[in-house]
Amino acid sequence: MAQQIELTNTVKDSQLGQRLDQAIAELFADFSRSRLKEWLLDGKVTVDGNVVTKPRTKVMGGEVITVLAELEDEVRWEAQDIPLDIVYEDDDILVINKPRDFVVHPGAGTPDGTVLNALLFHCPEVAEVPRAGIVHRLDKDTTGLMVVAKTVPAQTRLVRALQKRNITREYEAIAIGRMTAGGKVDKPIGRHATKRTLMAVSPMGKPAVTHFRVAEHFREHTRIRLRLETGRTHQIRVHMSYLQHPLLGDAAYGGRARIPAGASEDVTAMIRNFDRQALHAVMLRFEHPITGEEMEFHAPVPDDMVELTETLRRDAQEHGLPDEY
């Protein structure tokens, strides 16, 4: 069944001179460029109340853009009885704690067995919501908290809150190398020039900002806490790799095993055998899209990262930390 949707956002001053089709792609990032352009050409987009159908129209900043359209489901995904770790649920939203090895959305190579398929089984009503209510994603092997909308109004408002950076997402990670201080990475992220499944810091990419602080030192690794301002694909993994502190276990972005000198066999085995990026979405805070209530959720660090952390901590206690700490 087609869903009537209404999207509204304001053009940022930083978008001055952008083409309208480029501007709406940034403002309504939850929808594909091709779908947004189709709506634009069909007269479904207004700028300050006036219908505009020319993609090359320039924006100046400050305009209110509204999209009024019908959303047809492109594909009817299968509902599958896959367990979900539900942290919170009401009539409008669902918060889950995603385990490792769990893809969020069907795609090339993963036609089913995803979070989306599980959502369709658990709450069939999300079949009438774009993307089954998925507001943001976690990578396949990243664990932790995700919020899902169960209705179109809830999703529209959550997506808008995400675009306005009003949803707080914090992560815990183990980075390779000795990090002595926290900071901020403000570097745009785009598709990797040659490895098309990966992302990279790129001047042609989209704005991306990650804040981080040191939580605990180990001999050759650092436990860190991170907060996202933006939500680009692989953002934390790319930014930490850019800082030359890739996440332990993240082979795609340079997280090769680094063994501390004189490490025991147990420590060596733990580091070498940790086979996913050591990254967990530990905290999620946002305003409820319908009631306006401030909501905050926490997910305990999963067992594999707890064991990794305890192993690195014992190693540091046995051998002592480097003088630079």
Swiss-Prot record:
Keyword flag Signal: no
EC number: 5.4.99.23
Taxonomic superkingdom: Bacteria
Active site: D139
GO BP terms in the entry: enzyme-directed rRNA pseudouridine synthesis
This protein's record includes keyword Magnesium: no
Catalysed reactions, as listed in the record: uridine(1911/1915/1917) in 23S rRNA = pseudouridine(1911/1915/1917) in 23S rRNA
GO cellular component terms attached to this protein's record: cytoplasm
UniProt domain S4 RNA-binding: residue ranges: 18-91
Location, primary (coarse class): cytoplasm
Key words of the record: Cytoplasm, Isomerase, RNA-binding, rRNA processing
SMART domains with a match to the protein in the record: S4
Compartments (UniProt record): Cytoplasm
Record-level Gene Ontology MF annotations: 23S rRNA pseudouridine(1911/1915/1917) synthase activity; RNA binding
Database matches in InterPro entries: PsdUridine_synth_cat_dom_sf, PsdUridine_synth_RluA-like_CS, PsdUridine_synth_RluC/D, PsdUridine_synth_RsuA/RluA, RluA_PseudoU_synthase, S4_RNA-bd, S4_RNA-bd_sf
One protein family per Pfam: S4
Protein family per UniProt: Belongs to the pseudouridine synthase RluA family.
NCBIfam families linked to this entry: PRK11180.1, rluA_subfam
Biological role: Responsible for synthesis of pseudouridine from uracil at positions 1911, 1915 and 1917 in 23S ribosomal RNA.
Protein name from the UniProt record: Ribosomal large subunit pseudouridine synthase D
